[in-house]
Amino acid sequence: MGVDNLIQVFEDKYYIDLNGGILEAFGNLFSQNVTVLLYPMLKKDKLIDSNNLVVNNKMKNLYKFFKDNKKIIDIKDYNKKLLKIFSWKVLENIKKGKKDWEKDIPKNVSDLIKKKKLFGYS
């Protein structure tokens, strides 16, 4: 999972429909022996990983609990060239009909997206 996605996971607005809120969701997720392997990201040319990412102030202790218990682990062997590519941006470019999205993903994946007209490709 990418850092930007993990930050969103820690936003409690996504869990308002659950009786137990974010605690219920995280209890279900992590009770299944799930470990998040965290892919870093670049933000203003600074590498962000599990050690320096910032979550909502209300979630700091919950995040620290998962980090301290090795439920969130940094991926160390990552491709630096991929750090500036975001899935949401690729999807946005597909939907807008821009051609430059193809350079950001493997050719076999772009071929499949085009063949099956996935993600709004036309």
Locate predicted features.
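Active-site cores that bind ATP or allylic diphosphates and position pyrophosphate for catalysis
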Residues: 1-122
